[in-house]
């Protein structure tokens, strides 16, 4: 278990650096003479036609609907494994990160709504600061090496996974619209087929892949966001086969490098390019970016700490062995690194609004995430032992 976690964390740390490079490159291109090339590339129309099925979308939407569905497939596999066998498999293990994650979603959302109260156009972005980017947060923590206790890393990992689960629920409930009955029926049939494969003990991944593709197309056409198809597929793939092997973990390990070194960097590059030249000072300090930045930088640590403290005091949860509040606090600050997950929700929240709101949301996400990363890193570095244990 510990070896698997260490391997996961080391890969995510490398991915965090690549994510940062992708963001910097996107910002440079969006604010240089190459801006037209950057926007034109993302706006390139890509069409896939099979018989009566015709999918015709700009490259940006293929990235957000297609590649991110694979990322959510990976998240679903991780959540299922942790729920059945890992850090969330018992009430005692799951209690503290669960309360922490709930607080870390509610308080940032509340701060955002406080700044955007009474504006129906911008209020839809309330969930943007509720997300945590697991790759970037773990990458920042990994910079401190062996000084960080494994129990603290597991706490952040468990908290971020529960946070991801919350984001999945939020997308399903609040960012789906104009539902197509026929597409939902087809999606339901595909889900029944996936469940039947699981119940029959089918461990070959190919049948799940075929039905999963049908499900993804149906969900894409249904009005429900297509990334949710990835989560459903993940929950249907068996964790353990009769011979003791794990089809779910095999797929998870296969997807990890693709997610870490391709999917997330490509998503970050496609979504982080904010043209600053078109923004006035008033826009930069408007409720959307300020609400998001403060929600991430202040709301996340306040929510995580407040709910964790109350849960421990009420004996609903307990701190990990050897870990105190002075170590939990900077980790709570790191949870404010929303980055790719927050930008993804921003792309959904302001999909039908003026593009300016999407740019402001991404800018607020970048500012809040960078400040949260710096605060969390230096704070944790200060409270940890100077030498590795």
UniProtKB/Swiss-Prot annotation:
| Top-level lineage group | Bacteria
Biological process GO terms, please?
A: regulation of pH
Write down any Gene Ontology CC term.
Answer: plasma membrane
- The transmembrane segments are 17-37, 59-79, 95-115, 124-144, 154-174, 177-197, 213-233, 261-281, 287-307, 328-348, 363-383
**Gene3D superfamilies for this protein:** Na+/H+ antiporter like domain
Reaction(s) catalysed by this chain's protein: Na(+)(in) + 2 H(+)(out) = Na(+)(out) + 2 H(+)(in)
Primary role: Na(+)/H(+) antiporter that extrudes sodium in exchange for external protons.
Q: Which family does it belong to?
A: Belongs to the NhaA Na(+)/H(+) (TC 2.A.33) antiporter family.
Protein name per its UniProtKB record: Na(+)/H(+) antiporter NhaA
Which organism is this entry from? Shewanella sp. (strain ANA-3)
């Amino acid at each position: 278990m510990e070896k698997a976690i260490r391997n996961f964390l080391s890969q995510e740390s490398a991915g965090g650096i690549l994510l940062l490079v992708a963001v910097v490159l996107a910002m440079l291109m969006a604010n240089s003479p190459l801006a037209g090339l950057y926007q034109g590339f993302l706006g390139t129309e890509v069409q896939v036609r099979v018989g009566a099925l015709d999918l015709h979308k700009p490259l940006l939407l293929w990235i957000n609907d297609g590649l991110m569905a694979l990322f959510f497939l990976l998240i679903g596999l991780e959540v299922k494994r942790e729920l059945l066998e890992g850090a969330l498999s018992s009430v005692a293990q799951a209690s503290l990160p669960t309360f922490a994650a709930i607080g870390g979603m509610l308080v940032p959302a509340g701060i955002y709504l406080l700044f955007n109260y009474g504006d129906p156009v911008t209020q839809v972005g309330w969930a943007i600061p509720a997300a945590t980017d697991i790759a970037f947060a773990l990458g920042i923590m990994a910079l401190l090496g062996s000084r960080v206790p494994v129990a603290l890393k597991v706490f952040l990992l468990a908290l971020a996974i529960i946070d991801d689960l919350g984001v999945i629920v939020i997308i399903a409930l609040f960012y789906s619209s104009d539902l197509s009955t026929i597409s939902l029926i087809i999606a339901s049939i595909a889900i029944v087929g996936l469940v039947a494969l699981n119940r029959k003990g089918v461990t070959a991944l190919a049948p799940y892949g075929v039905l999963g593709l049908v499900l993804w197309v149906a969900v894409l056409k249904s009005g429900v966001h297509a990334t949710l198809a990835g989560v459903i597929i993940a929950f249907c793939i068996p964790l353990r086969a009769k011979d003791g092997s794990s089809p779910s973990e095999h797929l998870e390990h296969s997807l990890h490098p693709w997610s870490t070194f391709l999917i997330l960097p490509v998503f970050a590059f496609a979504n982080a390019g904010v043209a600053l030249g078109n923004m006035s000072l008033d826009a930069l300090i408007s409720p959307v970016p300020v609400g998001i930045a403060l929600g991430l930088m202040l709301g996340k640590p306040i929510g995580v700490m407040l709910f964790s403290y109350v849960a421990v005091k009420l004996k609903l949860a307990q701190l990990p062995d050897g870990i105190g509040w002075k170590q939990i606090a900077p980790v709570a600050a790191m949870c404010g690194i929303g980055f790719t997950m927050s930008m993804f929700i921003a792309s959904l929240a302001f999909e039908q609004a003026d593009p300016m709101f999407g740019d402001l949301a991404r800018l607020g996400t970048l500012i809040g995430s960078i400040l949260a990363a710096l605060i969390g890193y230096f704070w944790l570095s200060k409270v940890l032992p100077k030498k590795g244990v």
